[in-house]
Swiss-Prot record:
Belongs to the FKBP-type PPIase family. Tig subfamily. It comes from Streptococcus pneumoniae (strain Taiwan19F-14). Keywords: Cell cycle, Cell division, Chaperone, Cytoplasm, Isomerase, Rotamase. Signal peptide: none annotated. GO terms for biological process: 'de novo' cotranslational protein folding; cell division; chaperone-mediated protein folding; protein transport; protein unfolding. It catalyses: [protein]-peptidylproline (omega=180) = [protein]-peptidylproline (omega=0). HAMAP family: Trigger_factor_Tig (MF_00303). The keyword Protein biosynthesis does not apply. InterPro entries: PPIase_dom_sf, PPIase_FKBP_dom, Trig_fac, Trigger_fac_C, Trigger_fac_C_sf, Trigger_fac_ribosome-bd_bac, Trigger_fac_ribosome-bd_sf, Trigger_fact/SurA_dom_sf. It comes from the Bacteria. It is found in: Cytoplasm. One of its GO terms (cellular component) is cytoplasm. This is Trigger factor.
Length: 427
């Protein structure tokens, strides 16, 4: 194989390589044997057409595209490796020569990984806005949240207050004409929940069961039903019931209802304190890691980040998100319908993050390379076993999904992140 690379501009160039006749000839034979099985040529049994007759009738060149499709991927990878390139996007392939009996010549326009000039990435000073200490208020807030989850709605005679639930019938109209979707019966509405359009719930506060209230509201300009957006509507609303939330007493019985593993309220508080401490410690570590990596990225200089890398990151992120939806049994089309979004919206969402994520990945990879990090066979095996446990898969399944090179890359990245984080100090 002959390989050459010519820089055209920063992070871009043309990789020219050949596919030799030593590779082409056996592949031609293989493709011919496959093609002739389906050929019906008068005078010859199906699948028994001699090669010279085929070449005369159809031309050897008719097989070239299939041969190229078979040989090109490996030839391209070998050329990239021989040229010592780190390619970061799909190449634009141009077959410049496919002469009979000659080596084939391919020119690939490639985008290469940009140069990263590292700044300081060890012993960094960082600031984080995350508290590690667990306060009594934190514990009480957690218990109060669970206590409210066990609350019951009890009918009250007094007028409705913010936080109460009302059971209502309502009929909506615009200029005296009812509209689709504007009617409901025995609907339970939490006052202050924001379930209905702004202003609706507020107008029911102070009213009691048995009353009928004319609720006057204006639909928001960006309301999803365009025929209603920005219009004033009247909802004739009848209140059937007013219910108040009644929370259980704060005692040992409540503690046991919340968590059957505890006997007393004091036990529950102690358990929550430990859980909150562990969660805060994890959040603190994540914050330090994020701040340290952000600082290392700020200290580095990336020479002309290729736009293709950002596109690749967006594409990867979108595919990962859609894949996660499908693994959860959620059809992507249904997700877009429910959320009122499109795949283009999803692309735009990830576009905003892609440049930052791409820069971060490049800097961490550069740190791993600068430090000479590698991964042993033992570390790779341990990583495979951990992934299998995390995703409830067989070890062999993980090995089939992820190549040794991918696993090695992930391990070296983890080492780089650990180095940046472990040497950082918090101001």
């Amino acid at each position: 194989m002959s390989v050459s690379f010519e820089n055209k501009e920063t992070n871009r160039g043309v990789l020219t390589f050949t596919i030799s006749q030593d590779q082409i000839k056996p592949e031609l034979d293989r493709v011919f044997k496959s093609v002739k099985k389906s050929l019906n040529v008068p005078g010859f049994r199906k699948g028994h057409l001699p090669r010279p007759i085929f070449d005369k009738k159809f031309g050897e060149e008719s097989l070239y595209q299939d041969v190229m499709n078979a040989l090109l991927p490996n030839a391209y990878e070998a050329a990239v490796k021989e040229a010592g390139l780190e390619v970061v996007a799909q190449p634009k392939i141009d077959v410049t020569s496919m002469e009979k009996g000659q080596d084939w010549v391919i020119a690939a326009e490639v985008v290469t990984k940009p140069e990263v000039k590292l700044g300081d990435y060890k012993n960094l000073e960082v600031s984080v806005d995350v508290e590690k200490e667990v306060t009594d208020a934190d514990v009480e807030e957690r218990i109060e949240r669970e206590r409210n989850n066990l609350a019951e709605l009890v009918i009250k005679e007094a007028a409705a207050e913010d936080g109460d639930t009302v059971v209502i019938d309502f009929v909506g109209s615009i200029d005296g004409v009812e509209f689709d979707g504007g009617k409901g019966e025995n609907f339970s509405l939490g006052l202050g929940s924001g379930q209905f359009i702004p202003g609706f719930e507020d107008q029911l506060v102070g009213h009691s069961a048995g009353e009928t209230v004319d609720v006057i509201v204006t639909f928001p300009e960006d309301y999803q039903a365009e025929d209603l957006a920005g219009k004033e509507a009247k909802f004739v609303t009848t209140i059937h019931e007013v219910k108040a939330k009644e929370v259980p007493a704060l005692d040992d019985e409540l503690a046991k209802d919340i968590d059957e593993e505890v006997e007393t309220l004091a036990d529950l508080k102690e358990k929550y304190r430990k859980e909150l401490a562990a969660a805060k410690e994890e959040a603190y570590k994540d914050a330090v890691e994020g701040a340290a990596i952000d600082t290392a990225v700020e200290n580095a200089e990336i020479v002309e980040l290729p736009e293709e890398m950002i596109h690749e990151e967006v594409h990867r992120s979108v595919n990962e998100f859609l894949g996660n939806l499908q693994r959860q049994g959620i059809n992507p089309d249904m997700y877009f319908q429910i959320t009122g979004t499109t795949q283009e919206d999803l692309h735009n969402q990830y576009q905003a993050e892609a440049e930052s994520r791409t820069k971060t990945n490049l800097v961490i990879e550069a740190v791993a390379k600068a430090e000479g990090f590698d991964a042993s066979e033992e570390e790779i095996q341990k990583e495979v076993e951990q992934l299998a446990a995390d995703y409830n898969m067989e070890v062999a399944q993980v090995q089939n999904l992820l190549s040794a090179d991918m696993l090695k890359h992930d391990i070296t990245i983890k080492k780089a992140v650990e180095l940046i984080t472990s040497t950082a100090t918090v101001k």
